[in-house]
Amino acid sequence: QTSEKEGRSESRQERQELEETEIVTKSHQKNDWMEAEEKKKEEKEKEEEEEEKPKPGSIEENQLKDEKTKKDKESKNILSLCL
């Protein structure tokens, strides 16, 4: 009878250990999934921020275009004054 009780308690303990292992495994999987989703979200937000920022080259190009436009207008004004 004692060995039968020991056998049941061992199998019960093994089942509990298996259940605990499964719970821990599922918890880790859920955490990994949540971290991956959060990382994707952060990367997407970072990409959107980068798209919103004007590129440094484009600012310089715009400034050069503005200066050229101003010079062209000044040249036309000078020509019109001469005529």
UniProtKB/Swiss-Prot annotation:
Going by the entry's taxonomy, the superkingdom of the source organism is recorded as: Eukaryota
GO terms for molecular function, please?
actin binding; calmodulin binding
Reported modifications of this chain = In non-muscle cells, phosphorylation by CDC2 during mitosis causes caldesmon to dissociate from microfilaments. Phosphorylation reduces caldesmon binding to actin, myosin, and calmodulin as well as its inhibition of actomyosin ATPase activity. Phosphorylation also occurs in both quiescent and dividing smooth muscle cells with similar effects on the interaction with actin and calmodulin and on microfilaments reorganization.
Basic and acidic residues: compositionally biased ranges: 1-44, 62-76
GO-annotated cellular components? myofibril; stress fiber
Q: What ranges does the record give for the region Myosin and calmodulin-binding, renumbered to this chain? A: 1-63
Q: Where is this region: Disordered?
A: 1-83
Keyword list, A-Z: Actin-binding, Calmodulin-binding, Cytoplasm, Cytoskeleton, Muscle protein, Phosphoprotein
- Where in or outside the cell is it found? Cytoplasm, Cytoskeleton; Cytoplasm, Myofibril; Cytoplasm, Cytoskeleton, Stress fiber
On whether RNA-binding is a keyword of this UniProt record, the answer is no
Cytoplasm as a keyword of this entry, yes or no, is yes
Disulfide bond positions: none
Quote the function comment for this protein: Actin- and myosin-binding protein implicated in the regulation of actomyosin interactions in smooth muscle and nonmuscle cells (could act as a bridge between myosin and actin filaments). Stimulates actin binding of tropomyosin which increases the stabilization of actin filament structure. In muscle tissues, inhibits the actomyosin ATPase by binding to F-actin. This inhibition is attenuated by calcium-calmodulin and is potentiated by tropomyosin. Interacts with actin, myosin, two molecules of tropomyosin and with calmodulin.
Domains: what does the record tell us? The N-terminal part seems to be a myosin/calmodulin-binding domain, and the C-terminal a tropomyosin/actin/calmodulin-binding domain. These two domains are separated by a central helical region in the smooth-muscle form.
Can you name this protein? Non-muscle caldesmon
This chain's source organism reads Bos taurus
Gene responsible for this protein: CALD1
